């Protein structure tokens, strides 16, 4: 209500707000101090010591920024012209296939049961989703193949009856194919193949996935270099006051770089399980965002990887497509005697079967775009993946992002350690 006193912010929120304010103020303070240090004349003694935590903070911020960029960029190998083995490619693009397989093993298999998902498709809806013209064209092409094209095109009752029969029996055949695929979908559809191909074939997809799901956490790694590095730099300064051989600053600078990166990575993923200590909640920063990340991950996977075009392409041309077309052939063999009925046309079945299979293989890819919207609506994968991911135990959920840091953790720490040592040595030798 108007005029009501506002509730005090919780301690965790106040601490977070203070750290953000300090992080925003530090660069301007560092610039001012740097200007004083570089001004003509000998800088005052206190400034030499004050620069130690400022340099530590800024350097760790810069090295963490560099390390995060090195995770994802460049997306293709970039080497020296004459020394092609000397260069760099982002950790994620370089190991895209391995990481895509890890995502399948650690995440996708926990979210999606292929058999249950395909049961959501209604065979009659799929059969009706293909337009009448598709069935009519298919019937005429098959009739041409076996020498009965005149019947399909007859401008009489015969032609109308032929085409009507084709549409009725064609829909029955398509519905039976869908039911047969549902019965053994594990053999006809390879979930690993569609995910790995969708992610690893274009490294931009994998980079975008990790950047989107880990945006806040990657930003934390960068910004934590500033305030963690600055805080540890104060300890570094205190040590320098009582123990100041030139190499001590280099040694402590390297230690600050090492500890800063370790603390930042651990803060993202540890502790895995939520812990309450007084008014504070101790929980990995990434794990706190499980609901938010689940929504981002599900939306991304459904729109970019597990969408209807990719699903139909996997069925028709993927690694298990041989079994899919065997199912189609089996259903044609069952359907033809029923469609032709007893009589003169029954002996045509043996001739018609391979012709019909060949034409379906040719024409079905042209017809499935009419099924994309229906397929996405009936499978409805986004809420399924979102809800399943939200329900994952924390230890399983952290596998969504942790593999990126596991691959690059040593690189990030080595860069921070080496540059911290170099900066400390430069400070000591320059007298600033």
Task: Label each PLM-derived region with a short phrase.
Residues 1-38:
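Universal eukaryotic N-terminal targeting presequences
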Residues 24, 89-93, 225-228:
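Alpha-helical transmembrane segments and their juxtamembrane interface "caps"
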Residues 8-17, 38-214, 255-400:
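Large intracellular
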Residues 44, 48, 52-56, 204-250, ...:
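Transmembrane alpha-helical segments and their cytosolic interface motifs
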């Amino acid at each position: 209500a108007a005029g009501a006193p506002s509730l005090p912010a919780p301690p965790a929120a106040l601490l977070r707000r203070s750290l953000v304010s300090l992080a925003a103020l530090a660069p301007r303070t560092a610039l001012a101090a740097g200007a004083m240090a570089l001004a003509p004349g000998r800088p005052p003694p206190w400034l030499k010591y004050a620069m130690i935590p400022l340099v530590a903070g800024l350097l760790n911020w810069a090295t963490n920024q560099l390390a995060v960029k090195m995770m994802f960029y460049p997306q293709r190998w970039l080497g020296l012209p004459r020394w092609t083995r000397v260069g760099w490619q982002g950790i994620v693009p370089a190991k895209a296939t391995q990481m895509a397989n890890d995502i399948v093993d650690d995440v996708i298999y926990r979210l999606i049961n292929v058999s249950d998902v395909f049961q959501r498709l209604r065979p009659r809806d799929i059969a009706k989703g293909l337009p009448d013209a598709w069935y009519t064209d298919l019937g005429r092409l098959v009739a041409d193949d076996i020498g009965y094209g005149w019947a399909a095109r007859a401008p009489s009752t015969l032609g109308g009856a032929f085409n009507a029969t084709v549409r009725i029996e064609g829909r029955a055949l398509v519905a039976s194919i869908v039911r047969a695929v549902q019965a053994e979908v594990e053999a006809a559809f390879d979930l690993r193949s569609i995910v790995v191909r969708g992610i690893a074939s274009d490294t931009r997809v994998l980079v975008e996935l990790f950047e989107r799901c880990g945006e806040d956490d990657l930003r934390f790694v960068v910004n934590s270099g500033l305030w963690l590095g600055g805080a540890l730099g104060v300890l570094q300064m205190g040590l320098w006051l009582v123990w100041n051989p030139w190499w001590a600053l280099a040694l402590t600078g390297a230690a600050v770089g090492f500890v800063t990166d370790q603390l930042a990575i651990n803060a993202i993923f540890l502790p895995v399980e939520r812990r309450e200590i007084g008014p504070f909640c101790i929980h990995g920063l990434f794990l706190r965002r499980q609901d938010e990340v689940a929504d981002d991950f599900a939306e991304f996977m459904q729109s970019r990887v597990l969408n209807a075009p990719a699903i139909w392409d996997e069925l028709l041309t993927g690694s298990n497509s041989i079994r899919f077309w065997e199912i189609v052939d089996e259903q044609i063999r069952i359907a033809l005697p029923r469609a032709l009925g007893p009589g003169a046309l029954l002996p045509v079945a043996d001739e018609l079967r391979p012709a019909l299979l060949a034409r379906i293989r040719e024409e079905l890819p042209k017809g499935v775009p009419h099924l994309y919207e229906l397929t996405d609506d009936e499978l409805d994968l986004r809420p399924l993946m979102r809800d399943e991911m939200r329900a994952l135990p924390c230890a399983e959920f952290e596998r969504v992002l942790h593999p990126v840091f596991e691959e690059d953790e040593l690189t990030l720490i080595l860069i921070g350690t080496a540059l911290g040592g170099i900066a400390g040595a430069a400070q000591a030798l320059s007298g600033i």
